[in-house]
């Protein structure tokens, strides 16, 4: 079994994120810059805090084998579990369902763990609800 906690440890630090979203049938992309930081709070626990000109928040989560237990979801204030799929040592895919939408989120670490390429697709009843593309750059490393 892969120790998924190690992948999250590689993400600890402060990041800037250039994000592009397309919702439903909209042809207009929504671009946003978000800043986030990840800290390790225990051997298998982490905290993700984010902020932008539109919103801010904090999510705490625990790694349990190939499951992530989050205290909130990205689009929900309720606790959420995600199934993790390890593609290779640099890439993890999260599979999550809540609010009637199924999400597939892939994150790949690049350039000595200083860049993250991320993409998300959310579907409902076989139709695309949201697509997100993210270019994330490490700003500094937390201890």
Task: Identify the residue ranges that each predicted region occupies.
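A short, Trp-centered hydrophobic/proline-enriched beta-strand micro-motif
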Residues: 13-19, 116-118
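Acidic and generally charged, gly/proline-rich low-complexity regions
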Residues: 95, 101-107, 113, 117
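Short, solvent-exposed loop/hinge segments that bridge or flank secondary-structure elements
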Residues: 4-5, 17-47, 129-132, 139-141
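N-terminal helix-cap/turn-to-beta initiation motif at the start of protein domains
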Residues: 1-14
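Hydrophobic core segments of beta-strands in well-ordered, beta-rich domains
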Residues: 47-49, 117-120
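Intrinsically disordered, low-complexity linker/loop segments enriched in Gly/Pro
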Residues: 89, 112-116, 124
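Edge beta-strand at a domain terminus
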Residues: 108-109, 119-143
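Central antiparallel beta-sheet cores of small beta-barrel/beta-sandwich binding domains
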Residues: 25-103
């Amino acid at each position: 079994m892969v120790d998924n906690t190690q992948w999250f440890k590689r993400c600890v630090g402060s990041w800037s994120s250039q994000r592009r979203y397309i919702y439903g049938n909209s042809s207009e992309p929504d671009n946003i810059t978000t800043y986030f930081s990840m800290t390790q709070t225990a051997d298998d626990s982490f905290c993700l805090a984010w902020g932008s000109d539109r919103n801010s928040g904090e999510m705490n989560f625990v790694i349990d084998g190939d499951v992530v237990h989050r205290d909130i979801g990205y689009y929900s204030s309720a606790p959420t579990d995600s199934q993790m799929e390890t593609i290779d040592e640099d890439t993890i895919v999260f599979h999550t369902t809540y609010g009637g939408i199924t999400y597939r989120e892939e994150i790949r670490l690049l350039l000595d763990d200083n860049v993250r390429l991320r993409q998300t697709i959310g579907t409902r009843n076989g139709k695309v609800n949201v697509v997100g593309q993210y270019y994330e750059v490490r700003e500094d490393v937390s201890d």
